[in-house]
């Protein structure tokens, strides 16, 4: 657990001096999340070791909660540094915003994802608020009610079919995911005869508006612009993770007309050690779908049975931004 803690906490700590001291400090979060992660993935051997799948990790939840609390501190600090009277010059503000966005997309997102799968209501609530403060609260319902049930099929908006580039995917999923999740939550509320105030989308939309209002009151219009830019950066990475990890993989239809059960061959995985620790083992994605409630340190990786990405997950996200390059690399792997 110590390695998870060190690799995830350090970039969060760097945001403080980046915002308050500026200078070279302003560039360290983005350097850590790009150059350092890439270099360390190259230097450290791929990690295919597996912990005991039945083992318990008492410290794992404490780290999630701590990183969840850090998310809100990092968000407030980054917005102030980018849009407030921090004394940073334009380049430093841009670098800080970019670094913070990467932290939210590659640390906050995997942490919030783990939290919304927990059985403890407080932990699920924390994960919901993490997504909500990135204006992506609907992802909670879409992920739990749609993605995990229909992954690898046309009913899951977040499972990209072969040949769909990321930009078309992003435009489609942004609309479909929100509307489908809201419809399902409304139907659940009606069946359960819950008052409208308990509709999850009241939290997602209301919480997002409250965050916007708080930023506006504190830092004005420039603060809102900075917040929206950082949130959009994080949202793109949230969508990118699903795009990369499920691109072109489809569940077969059985003789009885039903889809085959979700298996280890329905997600792309990456064995690269440093970025996997950074993202609390999110690149071990197949096992998460097969064993949804397995603690992240115990997620299994089997390169013989699970589809493997040719490069680390963050690098694959960059490649996906160039459709021709992405298709040339991934379509043959999908066909194989």
Positions of predicted regions on the chain:
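Cytosolic/stromal cytosol-facing helical appendages immediately following the last transmembrane segment
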Residues: 1-16, 120-123, 127-128, 132-201, ...
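Alpha-helical bilayer-embedded segments of polytopic membrane proteins, i.e.
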Residues: 1-44, 59-83, 91-105, 197-240, ...
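Membrane-helix interface/capping segments
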Residues: 43-56, 250
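Intramembrane catalytic core of multi-pass membrane enzymes that act on lipidic substrates
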Residues: 51-174
């Amino acid at each position: 657990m110590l390695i998870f803690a060190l690799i995830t906490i350090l970039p969060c700590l760097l945001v403080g001096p980046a915002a308050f001291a500026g200078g070279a400090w302003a560039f360290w979060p983005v350097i850590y999340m790009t150059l350092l992660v890439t270099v360390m993935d190259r230097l450290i051997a791929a990690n295919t070791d597996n912990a005991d799948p039945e083992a318990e990790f008492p410290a794992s939840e404490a780290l999630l909660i701590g990183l969840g609390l850090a998310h809100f501190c990092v968000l407030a600090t980054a917005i102030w540094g980018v849009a407030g009277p921090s004394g940073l010059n334009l380049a430093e503000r841009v670098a800080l915003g970019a670094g913070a966005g990467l932290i939210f997309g590659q640390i906050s997102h995997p942490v919030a994802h783990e939290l919304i799968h927990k059985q403890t209501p407080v932990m699920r609530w924390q994960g919901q608020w993490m997504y909500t403060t990135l204006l992506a609260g609907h992802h909670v319902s879409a992920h739990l009610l749609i993605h995990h049930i229909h992954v690898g099929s046309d009913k899951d908006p977040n499972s990209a079919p072969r040949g769909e580039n990321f930009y078309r995917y992003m435009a489609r999923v942004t609309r479909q995911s929100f509307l489908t999740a809201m419809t399902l939550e409304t139907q659940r509320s009606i069946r359960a005869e819950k008052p409208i105030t308990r509709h999850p989308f009241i939290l997602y939309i209301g919480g997002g508006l409250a965050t916007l209002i708080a930023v506006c009151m504190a830092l004005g219009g420039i603060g809102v612009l900075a917040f929206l830019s950082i949130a959009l950066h994080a949202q793109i990475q949230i969508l990118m993770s699903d795009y990369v990890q499920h691109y072109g993989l489809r569940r077969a239809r059985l003789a009885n007309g039903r889809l085959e059960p979700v298996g280890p061959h329905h997600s792309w995985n990456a064995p690269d050690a440093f970025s996997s620790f950074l993202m609390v083992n999110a690149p071990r994605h197949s096992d998460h779908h097969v064993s949804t409630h397995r603690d992240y340190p115990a997620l299994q990786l089997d390169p013989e049975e699970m589809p493997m990405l040719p490069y680390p997950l963050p690098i694959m996200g960059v490649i996906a931004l160039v459709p021709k390059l992405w298709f040339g690399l991934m379509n043959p792997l999908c066909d194989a």
